[in-house]
Amino acid sequence: MLRLGSHVSMSGKKMLLGASEEAASYGSNTFMIYTGAPQNTRRKPIEELNIEAGLEHMKAHDMADIVVHAPYIINIGNSVKPETFELGVNFLQSEIERTRALGAKQIVLHPGAHVGEGADKGIKQIIQGLNEALIHDQDVQIALETMAGKGSECGRTFEELAQIIDGVTHNELLSVTFDTCHTHDAGYDIVNDFDGVLNEFDKIIGIDRLKVLHINDSKNERGAHKDRHANIGFGHIGFDALHYIVHHPQLSNIPKILETPYVGEDKASKKAPYKWEIAMLRNGEFDPDLLNKIQNS
């Protein structure tokens, strides 16, 4: 079954229930959430996440395979500042607990940045951090994300991700999130040769580790190492390639999550594009006037 959804907000009093309601309003049957603001460590206690009501709504609306995203502030690749590394390890452990409580099996993590110390040193630090953070009997996997290679990001090639996975003791607890924008921006030709890229992924990492797909178009040309998401069909990847990936038979059981930009001239009038983009990806017809329609809706 095609599991297609988007990033939604989990906030206010409704928390998980509100996230599921937002996802349902877009015609989604899965979704991704942050457990709080991605740029800080302020979090509500688990008992205030409104989990029971959220799970009931999810069941009634056929929501499944939901995904949690770890916050950006976690950087277990930092070997320069021990306090940043320790914060990352400790906060990752508490995020895993929240993920489990929410009933999710995957928590997406940007592997980390080496902050000028070089990829090898960054990767060693990430391995150390994951070895500290992972508890062997946990039932949540950390889904390491394919990165664009912006700045000092680690995980910009399949080889770098494989290096991290191979170094972690309990690597059965590691999976991978394949982000179409990041992978394109890292230099992989997912537009003309997605099957070739997928075969390469399978040889280097193993397709069985692929557990989450982030479906985003890109504002930049292939290999730009920028990581700037575009709306579906309005970037350098294009609708046909993204539709092909979403409906790829080898990826049929993997949740597909949109993280495309809100549409509008200014912050106050921006609108979520997900209802329209999900419908387009399901029915297979690109609407070149979509952005105007969203703005005028």
Curated annotation (Swiss-Prot):
<feature type="binding site">
    <location>
        <position position="229"/>
    </location>
    <ligand>
        <name>Zn(2+) 3</name>
    </ligand>
</feature>
<dbReference type="InterPro" id="IPR013022">
    <property type="entry name" value="Xyl_isomerase-like_TIM-brl"/>
</dbReference>
<feature type="binding site">
    <location>
        <position position="110"/>
    </location>
    <ligand>
        <name>Zn(2+) 1</name>
    </ligand>
</feature>
<feature type="binding site">
    <location>
        <position position="259"/>
    </location>
    <ligand>
        <name>Zn(2+) 2</name>
    </ligand>
</feature>
<keyword id="KW-0227">DNA damage</keyword>
<dbReference type="GO" id="GO:0008081">
    <property type="term" value="F:phosphoric diester hydrolase activity"/>
</dbReference>
<feature type="binding site">
    <location>
        <position position="179"/>
    </location>
    <ligand>
        <name>Zn(2+) 2</name>
    </ligand>
</feature>
<dbReference type="GO" id="GO:0008833">
    <property type="term" value="F:deoxyribonuclease IV (phage-T4-induced) activity"/>
</dbReference>
<protein>
    <recommendedName>
        <fullName>Probable endonuclease 4</fullName>
        <ecNumber>3.1.21.2</ecNumber>
    </recommendedName>
</protein>
<keyword id="KW-0862">Zinc</keyword>
<dbReference type="Pfam" id="PF01261">
    <property type="entry name" value="AP_endonuc_2"/>
</dbReference>
<dbReference type="GO" id="GO:0003677">
    <property type="term" value="F:DNA binding"/>
</dbReference>
<dbReference type="InterPro" id="IPR036237">
    <property type="entry name" value="Xyl_isomerase-like_sf"/>
</dbReference>
<keyword id="KW-0378">Hydrolase</keyword>
<keyword id="KW-0479">Metal-binding</keyword>
<keyword id="KW-0540">Nuclease</keyword>
<feature type="binding site">
    <location>
        <position position="214"/>
    </location>
    <ligand>
        <name>Zn(2+) 2</name>
    </ligand>
</feature>
<dbReference type="InterPro" id="IPR001719">
    <property type="entry name" value="AP_endonuc_2"/>
</dbReference>
<dbReference type="GO" id="GO:0006284">
    <property type="term" value="P:base-excision repair"/>
</dbReference>
<keyword id="KW-0255">Endonuclease</keyword>
<dbReference type="InterPro" id="IPR018246">
    <property type="entry name" value="AP_endonuc_F2_Zn_BS"/>
</dbReference>
<keyword id="KW-0234">DNA repair</keyword>
<feature type="binding site">
    <location>
        <position position="182"/>
    </location>
    <ligand>
        <name>Zn(2+) 3</name>
    </ligand>
</feature>
<comment type="function">
    <text>Endonuclease IV plays a role in DNA repair. It cleaves phosphodiester bonds at apurinic or apyrimidinic (AP) sites, generating a 3'-hydroxyl group and a 5'-terminal sugar phosphate.</text>
</comment>
<comment type="similarity">
    <text>Belongs to the AP endonuclease 2 family.</text>
</comment>
<feature type="binding site">
    <location>
        <position position="145"/>
    </location>
    <ligand>
        <name>Zn(2+) 2</name>
    </ligand>
</feature>
<feature type="binding site">
    <location>
        <position position="145"/>
    </location>
    <ligand>
        <name>Zn(2+) 1</name>
    </ligand>
</feature>
<feature type="binding site">
    <location>
        <position position="227"/>
    </location>
    <ligand>
        <name>Zn(2+) 3</name>
    </ligand>
</feature>
<dbReference type="GO" id="GO:0008270">
    <property type="term" value="F:zinc ion binding"/>
</dbReference>
<feature type="binding site">
    <location>
        <position position="69"/>
    </location>
    <ligand>
        <name>Zn(2+) 1</name>
    </ligand>
</feature>
<dbReference type="GO" id="GO:0003906">
    <property type="term" value="F:DNA-(apurinic or apyrimidinic site) endonuclease activity"/>
</dbReference>
